[in-house]
Amino acid sequence: MPAPTQLFFPLIRNCELSRIYGTACYCHHKHLCCSSSYIPQSRLRYTPHPAYATFCRPKENWWHYTQGRRYASTPQKFYLTPPQVNSILKANEYSFKVPEFDGKNVSSILGFDSNQLPANAPIEDRRSAATCLQTRGMLLGVFDGHAGCACSQAVSERLFYYIAVSLLPHETLLEIENAVESGRALLPILQWHKHPNDYFSKEASKLYFNSLRTYWQELIDLNTGESTDIDVKEALINAFKRLDNDISLEAQVGDPNSFLNYLVLRVAFSGATACVAHVDGVDLHVANTGDSRAMLGVQEEDGSWSALTLSNDHNAQNERELERLKLEHPKSEAKSVVKQDRLLGLLMPFRAFGDVKFKWSIDLQKRVIESGPDQLNDNEYTKFIPPNYHTPPYLTAEPEVTYHRLRPQDKFLVLATDGLWETMHRQDVVRIVGEYLTGMHHQQPIAVGGYKVTLGQMHGLLTERRTKMSSVFEDQNAATHLIRHAVGNNEFGTVDHERLSKMLSLPEELARMYRDDITIIVVQFNSHVVGAYQNQE
């Protein structure tokens, strides 16, 4: 019988298994990755299940093995230098400024900053940003993967095309289809703004294009040709649902190419949440599926900052989501559909792309697995059926869409995966970004917690805080600045280099126990243009 790592790898990395099932396991280079006793429940995308209580645990010489690998959790007195810290924090940062025409920016967006800090290896988060070329507006989104990065990668590549096609008028769709039929060059519909590390899958591009083409052909057939206004909310919902349907269909049909066949199955059996913003002038739409968030930074008349939430988490803390799930399934499942704050006791987000194990019937799952490649058929995770699985689907990718009309006081938008929101309160996020963008920082009073502090000690604390503040504003990217605070903040609300160094020095097998992947996009709005829209009305 193959070793547990051979059964699970590479569909899901073994480090991921220890998080999913809360068991100790070997990673592919024979190291003891992690143990459930050290992993906070909030860090688990899936909760442990008894069926796997012994599956991943080494059966022999367990005590001697853990002693021999003690180095993995032994604290080491090693600190990164400030340049080394900056190198890590800035490795994935990206900035885009909207170009000016005749010395003026006529867009409601000045530009955006984005960045990522991995905790998983490889990182499971993705990000995307693109300008719509055949319609107006800009699309920006963050995608949080689980059970691997296959689904988040696919969604980050494909979703914006589905949205752009959904927004196109009938005449443009016909023009694109005629160009494909005649072999002419296609009209570009998106201009991507990507970091060099943000890649596209060349091997799957033809498959993805064919699915997208089928979608716009159906839109052409459904449209009578009459000129009608496009409903952005409806377009976003249709795009999300259609992409998820295509992900499911591609996995069911398979592909003659063995690599693509395995790829589409990996995409379907893993999962991803998505939070996407579409900005067109003063019209801001946010489509959210899962537990990433969109937060608007509002500057009040007195100069202070307030946070306006533009998305809702789709998890057990959302009463409306709990009610929705209970209404969609028989009363006999009222106590089992959500257990321990997880869908069927396993999955934390209640909406997501992929995750076909929570959408397909049991018969369909068995048929696809049995006819699939050996890696899939021999994989215990894919063959595992969730408990109390009676009336699928239990999971949907349909987004909740929020509309907001921008005002001059709306200065920026923060899109971020839950790795940020788990470490920082929304008000702190908005305050830190607002102070960074304006260059004004309001110091918080130093709290000494009831201890007696001499004047000299207080002077030392103030001097230390001033020194740290001077180094923080070296960031040229608002998302980097926010990540620096999320990882390195101390009790005074300032960045502690020692703490930041320790957090960034954690080995791969330990980093995920302390934090999640963090992906952030900060969109800065053009208050002058937004104000001009308001004056015209």
From Swiss-Prot:
Organism field: Pongo abelii (Sumatran orangutan)
Residues given in the record as Mn(2+) 2 binding sites: 144, 418, 516
CDD domains: PP2Cc
All copies of domain PPM-type phosphatase, residue ranges: 109-525
Name of the molecule in the record: [Pyruvate dehydrogenase [acetyl-transferring]]-phosphatase 1, mitochondrial
Chain positions found as N6-acetyllysine: 202
GO cellular component, one term: mitochondrion
Subcellular localization(s) per the UniProt record: Mitochondrion
Xref: SMART domains: PP2Cc
